[in-house]
């Protein structure tokens, strides 16, 4: 099974970071968001990825082109023009990076990568800017059991701000980010 990762948006809400790189390449704990997402899928045995690039997609291509070098200990002998690799660290990943256009919407990106997932009976899909603790194994199991065309995760987000409980002009208590309004939103993980 493959996972398609949407990584082509402009990243306007993280503009201070995304001036030079796409949002999935913003680091968390020293590694790009994209790496964390892929590690989550690997935990559930999914190691084939199709990445839909757009805005500054070359940064993602360069990351994977140089991944082995950056994740290994090496000695460069400049005089002999040689490189000796001491330790190798490689993920079990097969990664296809596809330029799907800077302004392309989600459906267009999926259409553009169709040839890379057309031989699969189903595939996972997620956004390249969200890290979560979704149980992807259970999501796939649910999808198979229901026999539907698509399965998506839904979540009820907490409120955005802490709340004050007032008694007239006096603060009675503080409540840290109470439950939201009860609405369900797209959790960003799909099986198609």
Language model features: what each stretch is:
Residues 1-66:
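N-terminal glycine-rich phosphate-binding loop and ensuing alpha1 helix
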Residues 64-93:
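Short mixed-charge
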Residues 110-122:
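Active-site nucleotide-sugar/metal-binding loop of Leloir-type enzymes
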């Amino acid at each position: 099974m493959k996972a398609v990762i949407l990584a082509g948006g402009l990243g306007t809400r993280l503009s201070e970071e995304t001036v030079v790189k796409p949002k999935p390449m913003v680091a968390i704990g020293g590694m790009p968001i994209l790496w964390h997402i892929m590690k989550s899928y690997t935990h559930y045995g999914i190691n084939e990825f199709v990445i839909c690039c757009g805005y500054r997609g070359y940064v993602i291509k360069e990351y994977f082109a140089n991944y082995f070098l950056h994740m290994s200990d090496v000695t460069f002998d400049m005089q002999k023009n040689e490189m000796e690799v001491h330790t190798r660290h490689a993920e079990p990943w097969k990664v296809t990076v596809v330029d799907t256009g800077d302004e392309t919407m989600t459906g267009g990106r999926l259409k553009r990568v169709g040839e890379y997932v057309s031989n699969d009976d189903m595939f996972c899909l997620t956004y390249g800017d969200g890290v979560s603790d979704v149980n992807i194994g259970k999501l796939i199991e649910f999808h198979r059991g229901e026999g539907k065309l698509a399965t998506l995760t839904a979540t009820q987000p907490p409120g955005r701000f802490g709340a004050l409980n007032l008694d007239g002009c006096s603060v009675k208590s503080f409540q840290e980010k109470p439950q939201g309004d009860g609405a369900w939103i797209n959790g960003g993980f799909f099986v198609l």
